[in-house]
Amino acid sequence: MKGKPVLTQVSAEMMGQIVESVFVTMMNLEVFPSQDPWAPSNDQLTSAVHLSGEWNGAVLLECNRWQACRFAGRFLSMDPPESVNDDVRDVLGELTNMIGGNMKSAVTTGLTLSMPCVTDGSDYGLRVCGSEVQDRLGFECVEGPFWVTLLAVAPSRLTGSRLRN
């Protein structure tokens, strides 16, 4: 039985459709592509999930703290928390997990998706070894701009490590 063909590139169009679908379905929040430039901020939260298997990479969702609180309020159908708490982190992680999960099912069979992790602030470095930014998509909604970044590991980088040879 043949599985899905391995896609080595996930199109920006596909990622945009996935993000739009997740935000509308889970928060009744329309999002639109934006050209706002990405820049690290001390006020940002970054959520990440990693995909591994026949295709390897990660999906990052980045927004400011205020937005994350607003997203949590919408997602949980409650007043938004006044500050970042575990509910806010859980919602941001779940949104990223849903984006990654939708991407996982569109790419190939046999991929695993990590648990989401959420980082607060910008004084850190996130490195998925061997990966490069494939796409960084900006979005706009009533809560302001946010970004989704797709990191992809080139297949040659998976076998080319001197540590594994």
Language-model features: locations:
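N-terminal auxiliary interaction/assembly segments of multi-subunit proteins
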Residues: M1-N165
